[in-house]
From Swiss-Prot:
It comes from Canis lupus familiaris (Dog). Interacts with MINT, with XRCC6 (Ku70) and XRCC5 (Ku80). Residues 69-84 have a biased composition (Low complexity). GO terms for cellular component: cytosol; nuclear speck; nucleus. Residues 136-146 have a biased composition (Basic residues). Coiled coil: none annotated. GO terms for biological process: embryonic morphogenesis; negative regulation of DNA-templated transcription; negative regulation of transcription by RNA polymerase II; osteoblast differentiation; regulation of transcription by RNA polymerase II. Disulfide bonds: none annotated. It holds the Pfam family Homeodomain. The keyword Nuclease does not apply. Belongs to the Msh homeobox family. This is Homeobox protein MSX-2.
Amino acid sequence: MASPSKGSDLFSSDEEGPAALAGPGPGPGGAEGAAEERRVKVSSLPFSVEALMSDKKPPKGASPRPADSASAGAALRPLLLPGHGAREAPSPGPPGKPFEAASVKSESAEDGAAWMQEPGRYSPPPRHMSPTTCTLRKHKTNRKPRTPFTTSQLLALERKFRQKQYLSIAERAEFSSSLNLTETQVKIWFQNRRAKAKRLQEAELEKLKMAAKPMLPSGFSLPFPINSPLQAASIYGASYPFHRPVLPIPPVGLYATPVGYGMYHLS
């Protein structure tokens, strides 16, 4: 027969067995310990609010898992909506002032990284250049309007200009009174007509020079002017008593002999 002390020991051991296997019950001390352990784990993440505020680098040995880092980066990455600016996605964390400071800091860092990585996506809007205004030459305010000459007046002025380009004071006064014009109008018309005649004369001289220019092959030039009488006399010989007209010299390739010896013979 067992003693009472031994029986009590067996009874106590039987009650402690299931309790030891089940573990500590959900008491107030156990809940606080689990919450404290979870908070420590969250604060150890490099992307947590506490880590961003303290700017502490994680140890070299402990590197976060790829899934945790990817989820944390996606939580802090700003949302890009068409037509709106960058908005930060709500990230889990304890509310309060520390969360606001951390959100501002992460937003500035992520915005800078996004601008550096994708410059084409965040290009500034094109500038709308205003059309360049063409500045016209402004005439004088006191400028007199042009005189509308009639056909009969223009014919009389042209006829008088062909007779005499410069009119005296008496001739101008008489001529202007016959055309019902002022002396100033007649004077200005004659000045403009003389300038026009000079321009036409210069243009005609330029055309004559271009027509009289000899047709020489490209790359061929003479060391002397063709129209010079002294050089022409040296070509044809000094014994000629008169100057012969100078003809255009044909290209050198047509004759085997030197220039000038194919058509003319020296005396």
